[in-house]
Amino acid sequence: MNFPWALPADLSLIWWLDHAGHEADLITDHDLHAEGLACLAPCKAVRNGSHPGYHPEETMGATEAYLGQSGRIMYLGGNGYCWVTGTREGEPHCIEVGKLDSGSRVWQAEPGEGYLASTGQKSGLWHNRGRAPQNIVGLGFTAEGMDESQPFEHMPDSFHKRVAWIFDGLGDKDPIGDFGLAAGGAGGIGLDRYELGLGTPPHTLLVASTSDQSDNYPLVGEEVTGAFPGRGSTQDAQVRGDLIYFTTPQNGACRAAGSIAGSQALP
């Protein structure tokens, strides 16, 4: 792996904000967990980091409440809101995650580790508990790969007048992010997709998608129900990153681009 990850990747975003002259405050996961909706309520808009994968119920609930009360979120990361996460009361610096019986994981929970000691909740994926990430930001984890990133390409919804502002300065056929520090493009490393069956709001506009990922990007294991070939990007249309936009009640909105590489492809 020859590119930054997590905090070093997020520093690219902070540099870009400063370089572009945008004023922004930094809110940590600890802040959001301790203060809930009150932490986000004063914000005109909120932007995630590049890999917001570990969230307890409290921070997910605060994010949903913010969107439902005229909040505006830019989810520009990948593999977000993925793993059930617990914290010990009085010890916010310590989190607990149990990687249970599905999901992309580098270790497997042992017998007796199916429930978090810190909260008593069942561990594993939020997806398996009926709270797939698509229910919050419209996108959810679909693939990961480490070879090459690709640009996003326009989809038919990109020509809708409601999203013209997203493509200001781009031609109708211009690729979106055919450059970047994370494997050469804006779409890669970890990809999230639009999926109505998992909770993407039905009025969501699917404005752009990645294509041409290699077969080193397989479909995530939690969605593979049979052991047969054809689960790589060149054969499975679910293996892609999507860029979407949807509105919420009281004039809220979410613009989401499902890619960990995205924050390292800002001009």
Per-region residue spans from a language model:
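Intrinsic-disorder/low-complexity accessory segments
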Residues: 6-12, 49-50, 54, 72, ...
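Short alpha-beta junction capping motif
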Residues: 40-86
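Solvent-exposed loop/turn segments at secondary-structure junctions
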Residues: 31-34, 51-55, 79-83, 89, ...
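Loop/turn elements at helix/coil->beta-strand transitions in domains of secreted/extracellular proteins
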Residues: 19-25, 41-45, 68-73, 202-203, ...
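Aromatic-Pro/Gly-enriched surface loop or interdomain linker
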Residues: 1-39
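Generic beta-strand/beta-sheet core signal
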Residues: 27, 48-49, 76-77, 209, ...
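Short, well-structured alpha-helical interface segments that form or flank functional binding sites
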Residues: 8, 12, 41, 58, ...
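Glycine-rich, aromatic-lined ligand/substrate-binding cores of catalytic
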Residues: 91-94, 98-267
